Amino acid sequence: MANYTAADVKRLRELTGSGMMACKNALAEAEGDFDKAVEQLRIKGAKDVGKRAERTTAEGLVVSKDGVLLELDCETDFVAKNEDFLKLAESIVTVAAAAKPADVDALKALELDGKTVDTVIQEQSAKIGEKLVLSKIASFDGPVAVYLHKRSADLPPAVGVLVEYTGEGDAAAEAARGAAMQVAALKAKYVTRDEVPEDIVANERHIAEETARAEGKPEQALPKIIEGRVNGYFKDVVLTEQSSVQDSKKSVKAILDEAGVTIKRFVRFEVGASS
């Protein structure tokens, strides 16, 4: 006969965040001694940290606050919508918004509830039972627009874009948010074509030329064909040269110009993406 009650199991789960069977086993091994059961689960959690470190984190969320965008990753979508995980992300982004750290390492070193952010993450990892990774952070100073996209209604945002812009008024803010939505959808990498590195442009020209020659295009037509294909590349990766997802008859640049907006920079985070 078990020397613990269902109430003990419930209390232990609430205190440690461990699964039902883990709590039952801990209470059984501790012969009903609640404090010993807590200690055993804490020790097991510490031992599991090394194992968790080797696992991949392909789920998670992107969250934003006051000019900060950050990504917190986990292993499963079940944890991605876990209340403790959501609260952890909100706590971290609140700290980040106040301090505006330069990078992930700087954010991990900041204080949260009397501990470092990194320590809090590791403690939550042990409690939840999954590897948790604070993978990305960006912080902008000027007026910003944010767009967060959910892949599924029951999950938190998995794609986030933070745009810094110049412009005034509601129309400018709306246009900037439209630009953020554009980046989320079409994955632009640059604001203008001037930002595209010369070596990348040169490589695109080389590919366009070699492809055209392989297709047997006439020599005299090559310059125009190459230019057209390079311009096509710019439309793929340059925000201001794309057709707007909100109004396909206009370019993003035209919409921004109408609202008096200049995009200074942007970042796009996507859970599960390598960069």
UniProtKB/Swiss-Prot annotation:
Segments of this protein annotated with the region Involved in Mg(2+) ion dislocation from EF-Tu: 76-79
Entry keyword annotation includes Protein biosynthesis: yes
Domain of life: Bacteria
GO-annotated molecular function: translation elongation factor activity
Gene Ontology CC: cytoplasm
Keywords (A to Z) from UniProt: Cytoplasm, Elongation factor, Protein biosynthesis
Subcellular localization(s) per the UniProt record: Cytoplasm
HAMAP family in the record: EF_Ts (MF_00050)
Protein name per UniProt: Elongation factor Ts
